[in-house]
């Protein structure tokens, strides 16, 4: 897992250097992450040959939806990066509502796809999928939070 954390750290090292990211840059960033991630999933989840095709169909569907949530998160983080120095109490409340809702959306997505993976493979494969996704999200959140400056009280 240390190798995995290192990969994640490398992918997210420049997150707060985005100044005015456009959709193409976000898509490129996510496609790079998606390629690395699929190799990681293949290594750790290891669906059996009999279920492999069904697993990857469900996984690809999950990734499509996860990327949408990822884009929303990147946009929110860009907003934070440009506003944190002058953020008001009201703006912080609004930003927190959005990020909490996004975290909930992401967590529900994983649970939903855990159930789908369990139906097309085995409970063990589904559990590994859930463990890996939770690990990756936790590691990514850690890397992001580690780079985020604290908002000053005005």
Residue ranges and their predicted role:
Residues 6-7, 41, 77, 132:
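General helical structural elements
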Residues 26-27, 40-120:
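Amphipathic alpha-helical segments
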Residues 25-28, 32-35, 39, 44, ...:
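Amphipathic, charged alpha-helical segments and their helix-to-coil junctions
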Residues 5-8, 12, 52, 84, ...:
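Secondary-structure transition/capping residues
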Residues 1-25:
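Bacterial Sec-dependent N-terminal signal peptides
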